[in-house]
Curated annotation (Swiss-Prot):
Protein task: Controls reversibly actin polymerization and depolymerization in a pH-sensitive manner. Its F-actin depolymerization activity is regulated by association with CSPR3. It has the ability to bind G- and F-actin in a 1:1 ratio of cofilin to actin. It is the major component of intranuclear and cytoplasmic actin rods. Required for muscle maintenance. May play a role during the exchange of alpha-actin forms during the early postnatal remodeling of the sarcomere.
UniProt superkingdom: Eukaryota
Protein name (database record): Cofilin-2
GO molecular function: actin filament binding
Record CDD domains: ADF_cofilin_like
Modified residues (Phosphoserine): S3
PTM sites of type Phosphothreonine: T6
UniProt keywords, alphabetically: Acetylation, Actin-binding, Cytoplasm, Cytoskeleton, Disease variant, Nemaline myopathy, Nucleus, Phosphoprotein
Species annotation: Homo sapiens
Amino acid sequence: MASGVTVNDEVIKVFNDMKVRKSSTQEEIKKRKKAVLFCLSDDKRQIIVEEAKQILVGDIGDTVEDPYTSFVKLLPLNDCRYALYDATYETKESKKEDLVFIFWAPESAPLKSKMIYASSKDAIKKKFTGIKHEWQVNGLDDIKDRSTLGEKLGGNVVVSLEGKPL
């Protein structure tokens, strides 16, 4: 069921910037988004980039020690969100980077919010072409352990996520 919610152009720009890994200067790399949250606008008509809810590559090792743990802390405990997380992980064969689309719908979120976000998910997913990994998360217990994301990325072949062993 479509909700009539549209996707703001800034959301698409953020996605395209995260998806394309072109050779960049060190300064440009630091400004790349590692993780970003998207929410509904106040009038519930648009999916927008949530202000100040992002992690930049340049933050890692500076204000952010562990990007995965910091990302989990950005998620609101009592409301839904969409998120993009640029996962850096290692399998037994090689190092990889993949974007993960996350639909955060905690049990404690209001029913109306869960319904609007669930019915609007297709609108944002259609704009995020080429995403290999999608994950619906219904509470902190599902996401706080990085090994759960490791399983989503490659089953039991993933040996580390963000440089930390699973």
